[in-house]
Amino acid sequence: MHKYRTHNCNELQLSNVGQEVKLSGWVHRRRDHGNLVFIDLRDHYGITQIVFTDQNQHLMDYASNLCYESVITVSGTVVARSEGTINNKLLTGHIEVLAVECIVESASSPLPFVINNEKEAPEESRLKHRFLDLRREKLHNNIILRSQVISHIRHLMIVRGFTEFQTPILTSSSPEGARDFLVPSRIHPGKFYALPQAPQQFKQLLMIAGFDRYFQIAPCFRDEDARADRSPGEFYQLDLEMSFVTQEDIFNTIEPVLYDLFTKFTDKIVSKPPFVRIPYNESMLKYGSDKPDLRNPIIISDVTEIFRDSNFTIFRENIKKGSVVRAIHAPKAASLPRSFFDKMIEFAISEGAIGLSYIQFSETGEVKGPLSKFLTKQQLEILKATSNTSNGDAVFFASDQKDKAAKLCGKVRIKLGEELNLLEKDCFKFCWITDFPFYEFNEETGKIDFSHNPFSMPQGGIDALEQAKTTEELLALTAYQYDIVCNGIELSSGAIRNHKPEIMYKAFSIAGYSAEEVDKRFGAMIRAFKFGAPPHGGIAPGIDRIVMLLAEATNIREIIAFPLNQQAEDLLMNSPSYVDEKALKELSIMLSPTSRKIHKKNTGL
């Protein structure tokens, strides 16, 4: 018989009754019934009930003193449970093991929190003792799910003709939109590697090298703050790139992958390909966001023209100054109490708005609310038609500059969806956001900057760049860039790449980069483009966010085995940590006086 186990703890069935077996695992629960002691023995696979009887008093006394989470090996005989003790919640619930021997392989110290239920524990303690936290059923299953998702992704990509690559982790800094993690070079004093924010340049170089379809489960590193759906420091993405493709080719490739993935690992309704396509400007108008949650049926409408000649002075004057007026439809909200409308106004103010106004259309057709007296009957009818409002509904209004109004209305839309319980349940709704602006105006520098990915192909190519002369014309340029969104969460960004050196030089010059700077920062790419680059494009759905959605986790740390906390610290490994002076000298690093004082205090060196 094997030293530790003949079966795992999720394996024994009625067909095993009478067999001598050996099991190993953790003490999950212990119940002392006087003449019987029951131990729920848990391993990676499941739970088996072990029974100790007073026929072996010494062994039963031994079992009654076992600490939770101690590792034990038990030998015994499989017996059928009596009719009244069957546990249908367990796969092994029809049997139990009558113990004849028990060996403690490793005793557990007192636990910092309970393992055998999902009772909330302090996050600091959970992260500091992550090896214990990972034993808890929900988190344990999340990590298994993550592994299964990644394995299935690999299968789906390989059967579609993609080749898996590994690209360098130590590379050079590039403007991907976040701060780099820098690694000092010992051999080249004063120089630094950067951990890749994405394998962007390498995957494009692979296309130029003649590989047709690339993919990688790619680690990415960005020095940015944590959010519920964003881990600080490190994340993983399904990175892919394809040669000789259009935007539609990318869509047609990734949509079936996501549909297959989500239908395999969930019972919820999943959007079928082709997914809805929404141009960026339309998304910002209708949803107030470039990552709309389509489970929410509320649509935002532009009603600027209705108020341009209205009697409401505030909106009329705002419009003269270039502001817009937006209407947010609130279905079946007309009969709600005044406190509901006051709550929505308070919410808008908390989000930076001056206020929020509204009109109520009762079931009988009566019009009420602060703005109702400022609109004519005809204007009210146009408003109802424009905002798709019926009797029994309410409409909220916001007025501001276009971008500010869009963002505010987007937040109000989300809040209304929650307050009115409008979100469609048990579904994953996908959409594409397309035609992103190529450039944006940087308020801090007062200059034109890239809106998203600087390596995207501008729609219209070199002609569009050369014909756009004014700031307004430049900001109107769009890129072959697209995001995929699911239930209001951005899963991925992608683009058709700029593969022509002359277009890249021109695009960067508009953003304030000289040809010399472009050559210095992207020398490998520019050189490669001059030796025959195929048209190519790609996308990179986030693995962490996909698993987060499938696991129905509210925080991304719940689907990562060893995550950092909100302050980008690893409490388990005590990272980041101070290093000794010798290591700093080897790397030619000198700390500032303030940092040196802190370093000395914490290291004693």
Curated annotation (Swiss-Prot):
GO BP annotations listed: aspartyl-tRNA aminoacylation
Cellular component GO terms, alphabetical: cytoplasm
Catalytic activity: tRNA(Asx) + L-aspartate + ATP = L-aspartyl-tRNA(Asx) + AMP + diphosphate
Annotated binding of ATP, by residue: 222-224, 490, 542-545
Binding-site positions, L-aspartate: 176, 222, 452, 497
Enzyme Commission identifier(s): 6.1.1.23
Keywords from the UniProt entry: Aminoacyl-tRNA synthetase, ATP-binding, Cytoplasm, Ligase, Nucleotide-binding, Protein biosynthesis
A Pfam family this chain is assigned to: GAD
Protein name: Aspartate--tRNA(Asp/Asn) ligase
Lineage: Bacteria, Pseudomonadati, Pseudomonadota, Alphaproteobacteria, Rickettsiales
